[in-house]
């Protein structure tokens, strides 16, 4: 919800144990929640998807049945589009706990839009540090091309090159 023409806030709470396949059985693992609060700035409401800076804080409760400790974190992100054609984006996040995939993560990237077709091509690099000290950091690069066939139909092939594997133990 916008609180003025440039500042917006979003918040939410979800079942931390919820899955799309659990037939709407809410809180089966108990009242364990994922909560978030998000505040952002954009030059105008019309530009909110193309030019913005935002911060999000989150917390997930301990999930006793699964043996997962509570965790929390914060993310700062921004994207900016020039001439309706080139978008640069950046995101940095920090968290505490063993539940997140990464406790530290940074991403930089860019997207180019072909004005005559609405196709997009993008490239991003990410570096992340998993919460387990026995796992290595990961640096990866992703490239994609979104072929926009019509307003409601797009196909987006992508390729990812991971330079290290966080699920592989560090070789000593």
What positions do the PLM features span?
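Outer-membrane beta-barrel transmembrane strands
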Residues: 1-2, 9-12, 57, 157, ...
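Conserved active-site loop/cleft motifs that coordinate metal ions or position small ligands
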Residues: 10, 121-124, 144, 149, ...
